[in-house]
């Protein structure tokens, strides 16, 4: 194959692989991601404020494979697939102060948690 068609083919393959992905999804792993949060003091919104907090977003490694013979025997041949996975989770938190604007031009404050660091860790149904 001549050189020019090979280069064109590689460029087209590169476009096909990366099209439709945002920069964040193109980077493997688990990363901090900012999002806007609105805090209200009560259901009526007597005091409220907003803050950019951090979440953990991304993907981590997982795998599934046929179980070993010893696992099959021990499970009565019911556990024929063994899987292992990790989930993107918050590894540490920090408190941040949110300033609230209240009715009557009063001001208040409230502390909320935001992610400080993220990591791939054992998947859990619920941590809280």
From Swiss-Prot:
It comes from the Eukaryota. Its main location: secreted. GO terms for molecular function: hormone activity; protein heterodimerization activity; thyrotropin-releasing hormone receptor binding. Coiled coil: none annotated. Disulfide bonds join 30-88, 47-102, 56-118, 60-120. Residues 1-20 form the signal peptide. Glycans are attached at residues 36, 80. The keyword Transcription does not apply. The keyword Methyltransferase does not apply. It is found in: Secreted. GO terms for biological process: adenylate cyclase-activating G protein-coupled receptor signaling pathway; cell surface receptor signaling pathway; regulation of signal transduction. GO terms for cellular component: extracellular region. Keywords: Disulfide bond, Glycoprotein, Hormone, Secreted, Signal. Belongs to the glycoprotein hormones subunit alpha family. Heterodimer with GPHB5; this heterodimer interacts with thyroid-stimulating hormone receptor (TSHR), and hence stimulates cAMP production. Functions as a heterodimeric glycoprotein hormone with GPHB5 able to bind and activate the thyroid-stimulating hormone receptor (TSHR), leading to increased cAMP production. Plays a central role in controlling thyroid cell metabolism. This is Glycoprotein hormone alpha-2. It comes from Mus musculus.
